[in-house]
Amino acid sequence: HAGSDDIFAPYADPAYDRKKVMQLGSYVERENADLEWKMLQELYPELRSKTPEVIRTRINGQIFYRLVLHSESGGFLSLCNRLRGDRVQCLLR
């Protein structure tokens, strides 16, 4: 049985560096996605040059707002693993 800490385990497979989407959170309120982005930019200066997208999605009838970054070339692995090490949600897909 996987523990809840698994969401913060680093990605071990280097193939994840080719993933083009890095999701930094999923929120019930759009404003929370915007606030999270501002906080992450303060904590991680390398994010200041990035432009996020907030994607509205419906899961089991509930609306969520996903905070994501896109990159055609990937390259998110190192940053995502650093975020996970700091217990910040980060999914590569």
Feature annotation, model-predicted:
Residues A2-D17, V28-R93:
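Extracytoplasmic
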Residues M22-L24:
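A short beta-strand micro-motif
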